[in-house]
């Protein structure tokens, strides 16, 4: 789509993002940048692109990898892919709820390793119920609400905490109850994170909150890794303050080969695949391309982060 209207330089290599030097070289004197959340787009990258840069189109919903304030100051539009990935990410969040509580990965490994010797056993891989439990959601926005809809099919009680405004629609439609953060962590059987990453939410889940969680509860994160203090989470898992965790995101991606998380049996770890379905990723690519082309053609982007920008 883009190559029909623009000269395109591809910086990424399949299987890995571009290095910093590769990125700085690729953006030189460009009118537009189409990036992913693995690409840190800061003032130095904008300097390398030069005065022609008009738009930074992110192939993602989150834009915490882009210096929005700097782009706006320079008159550069920043676009994102909106709510396209909502349902796919909600599916994965609920998959992690089921996988952690019912020991699905442990069961798969038991069978494939040929260590399952004696058929049905009344004590084999006993997990935790999901139906009828309490789901706590941090950030009852688009994705959090989609997870809540799925939870109602399991007769779960829904409590939530938003850092700012309440979600009155979800309260009325699904009986979701807004509580403070302390009550949320204390009462949740499953705590699922769906808020954006910013200075207020960075390390929102740390030792003080983890210690207040039930020792048979689980934490699920499909949002951003930096919402959780990973060192504190590892401590909580080792000392059994909580029963387990399902993580699609990490503080550093990929996690260090020496991370204790990789050795734990009470975690399910995924490589940041919340939106990874053929249909969702295709739609994201189309929107990212349209956003970029719309700006270059002096049209309105579909999803714009900084509408207040004074264009170059």
Predicted regions and their residues:
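Phosphate-binding beta-alpha-beta segment of Rossmann-like dinucleotide-binding domains, i.e.
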Residues: 82-134, 146-149, 163, 168
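Rossmann-like adenosine-cofactor binding region
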Residues: 41-45, 163-260
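Phosphate-coordination loops involved in phosphoryl transfer and adenosine-cofactor binding
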Residues: 53, 131-134, 207, 216
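An N-terminal-biased, well-structured beta-alpha scaffold segment characteristic
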Residues: 1-79, 206
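C-terminal helix-to-coil terminal segments
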Residues: 72, 79-91, 106-107, 119-126, ...
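Conserved beta-strand positions in the Rossmann-like core of class I SAM-dependent methyltransferases
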Residues: 9, 159, 226
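Glycine-rich Rossmann-fold phosphate-binding loop(s) that bind the pyrophosphate
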Residues: 140-141
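Short beta->alpha connector loops at strand-helix junctions that form conserved
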Residues: 11-12, 59-60, 75-87, 162, ...
